[in-house]
Amino acid sequence: MSEAGYRMYEKSVGSGKRFAFSCDTAELKHYLSRRKASLEKVRENFEPLWKEIRLYFEPNFGKALLGNSDRDQSASTRDDEKILNSEPRQCVHRYSAGMQSGITNKAQPWCSIVPKLIDEEESADPELNKWCNNATTEILSALERANFYRVSQNVYPHAALFGTSAILILRGEEPGDIHFHLIDEGDYWISCDRYGQVNTLMRRVSMTLDQAREEFFWENLPESWRNQIKEGKLEERVEVMNLICPNDGSEKFKDIDKSRAYASIYWLDKQGGAENNGILDISSFSYKPFAVLRQMDSGAVYGKGLGEMSLPDCKELQKLEEYLLRMIANEAEPAMIAPSSMKGQPINMFPGGVTFYDGMMQSGAAPVGRLFQTQEGIDKVDIKIRDIASRIGSIWYNDLFAMMLQVNTANRNQKTATEVAELSAEKVTLLGPVLTQMDEFLTSVIDGVFRILIEDGAIGEPPEVLMSGDADISVEYTSTIHAEMRAALKMRAINMLIEMTTMLAPAKPGALDKIDEDHIIDTVCKVYPGAAAFVKKTSEVMKIREARSREQQQAIANQQLAEMMKNAGANAKALSETHIGNGNALEAVMGGAA
């Protein structure tokens, strides 16, 4: 049964319009309150840092940390007073654009379902290959139909700023439809299992009364909400809590079938009265309905991000920017010094203005002048600001994305192929730890989408070899950055081998005998599939080599024949010049032969 169908089944088993919960709602509400307090206690240690990060980098993120339940009001309020230099803010969005285009680029396939644990020298079962290709196509199509790419471009900056980012993976109304929802920082709490994997997510949901009416049973809504809905106040916002956790099959989850993997409970934290003790809805999922990205694993529940790493530099940058603006203002409208005798007299500082002064001019100096000079200080502060901005950009990998662009365009004409490969490899490998964390997040996304499509029948039945356990499947990431990293590692080894062999060859010519040039070319074609179009087939190469071998053998034979003819002529001449009796040696030989 599909997720939507299962949810409708769960809701239909009640009497009338109210869901007849089988569990003890009072006990469940007590459990939820304790769970909420426990999760909040863990996260409150991180909140001061997150609040500071958002103010210095991107105040539009983490609005939920302000505690304002009216999200429309908080979204319309500016709180970017601490940002005088927008470079850190731009770094965040450049990073987001770089990761989106390099990892989850909608314009090209960035993942594929592949057979697992099959030897590279052997080919997978043709039926399994066909099924994997179909699964890949369906997954990428579902992601494109959904709002995944709009959500993912915000996942990257959230995780980079705060260290952690979370999304929901929800089934749509129609089979095969999927909806993704980004949860803003401050609106969710998480917990991990013993393996360090996030398995519990609690979130605070701000929704309009119209949305609440669509989401929950009418009779389960508080009476005050129902009255407001009847009055047409559909845009009034309310706040509910939602806990998504593994279904342990206990009494508190009595309303959920034990075969379901995850339980989801909506409840009112501060109200609810006698109506089911504030429990609004109990539902379930057959898959993990959320994915969490932790930028850097710090050993804690929540990750560490680039925002924390670059926060000291960002603070210093804003402070220096304030100094610079003040100095520029002093340069434009400088503090002045004048003799006390001019106190109370007007000074005309406009262009062409005249100020009358009755005192004596000393040493040719003007009676009114600047109190101090600021130009030299402006230059020094400006240089320091650029230096700090460059450091922040490096932390946010902006120089890496710029370098990758330059390596592939203008600078390519100024560098050798080896230099380009080495430079590209050096830069891309810096993203290795980041990609490891990204893969964990993306695997959760692909797994959720895959399970939904399987249950909805969008992906056909798995082949027998997969059902029997003789083979398995896995996700392979083929994005630009993933491919570049794999290529960089392989090409570095190939280039090192060729370089070392070339160095040894002059002293030890036999070293070249160890090199299999055909295998090197084939490996490079696997690393860069586009290059295969310019490489001849093995059969054609064999014909060319055979023809070349015949030509070389013929040339050697002709040379040997020429040498023999040359030697024969020289010998004949020598014999003819050797006198024997009345003749010469050549005549004697020819006569003897006769």
Question: Where are the language model's segments positioned?
Answer:
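Short, hydrophobic/amphipathic alpha-helical patches that form generic packing surfaces
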Residues: 55, 59, 93-104, 164, ...
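A broad, low-specificity signal for short, low-complexity segments enriched in glycine/proline
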Residues: 125-131, 199, 295-299, 353-355, ...
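C-terminal anchoring/interaction modules
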Residues: 1-41, 57-58, 64, 336-594
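An N-terminal domain-start capping segment
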Residues: 57-85, 156, 229-260, 356-374
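Short, surface-exposed loop and linker segments with low hydrophobicity and enrichment for Pro/Ser/Thr
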Residues: 153-162, 227-238, 250-260, 311, ...
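Structured, contiguous alpha/beta core segments that scaffold functional sites
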Residues: 2, 6-26, 30-34, 171-351
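Long, contiguous amphipathic alpha-helices that act as assembly "spine/axial" helices in icosahedral shell
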Residues: 124-171, 302-338, 373-406, 419-453
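Extended, helix-rich architectural segments
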Residues: 1-234
